[in-house]
Amino acid sequence: ISKNIKAVNEVYTGKAPKKDIGQSPLQVAIKCGEFEIIEFLLENGADPDFMENPEVVPPHSVCMPVLHDAIIGAFSALCYKQYMQSEKYVNLIKILLEYGANPNRKTSSEILPIGMAVNQADFILSRKSAYPDIQEITQKRLLEILDLLIEYGADKKEWLDQDFWGVSNKVHYFEEKQYGTNNIDIREPIRIVLEGYFH
C-alpha cells in the first residue's frame, strides 16, 4: 500500500452481493473495528471523507461518509458493552475530523453527522428496558461526539432546522412527544440530553 497510494481509496466492484461493494479499505476497516489498519490507511493517504458511489453499491443501499460509520461504531459497541471499543471509535471520530472529514456531510438519505449521533443515541435511550446498563454512558458518549463535531464546524442550526420527519428536528425532538407502552414518553430521555446541550 505504501508503494501504491491509490490502493487505499480503491473500491470493490465485484458482481457478488457482498456488503463491501463500493467501499474503500478504510470504510471496511472502520466497520470491522480494525484500528491499527485504520491508522495505517490514513497515514498512507486514505480519504477521510470517503463515501460510496450510489451507482456502484447494491440497490436501496444507504451510502454514507466514513465519519458516519465511526459514529455508528461508537454506539454499536456500547450495545455489546464493549466500552473500550466505543472509546476508540470516539477517538477515531476526532482523528477523521483532524484529517479533514466534513462534519456536515450527509448520507445519501440526507442524515447529517449530528443527526446520525442523535439517532444512534435515541435508539438506545428510548429502549431503557433493553439497554438498562448503558443509559448513562450513552448520554455521555453523545455529548462527547457532539462536542467534537461542533468543534470542527458542524452546523447546529442546519440540523435543528432540517425537515427530516415532516417537521424540523427542533420540533421532533424538543416539542413533540412519543408515547410508548404504559403511556410513557419514550422521547423524553433524548430530549433531556439535547435540551441541556442546545439551549
Q: In which residue ranges do the predicted regions lie?
A:
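Ankyrin-repeat boundary/"N-cap" motif
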Residues: N9-V28, M51-Y80, K106-P132, W159-K177
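Long, low-complexity, intrinsically disordered N-terminal extensions of eukaryotic proteins, enriched
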Residues: S2-K6, K19-Q23, Q27-K31, T181-H199
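Short coil/linker segments at helix-helix boundaries
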Residues: C79-V90, R127-L143
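Ankyrin repeat domain, specifically the short helix-to-loop turn at the C-terminus of the second helix
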Residues: I1-A7, Y12-T13, E39-P48, L92-N102, ...
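Conserved ankyrin/ankyrin-like repeat signature
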Residues: E36-I37, K88-L92, R141-I145, P189-I190
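Leucine-rich solenoid repeat scaffolds
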Residues: L146-Y197
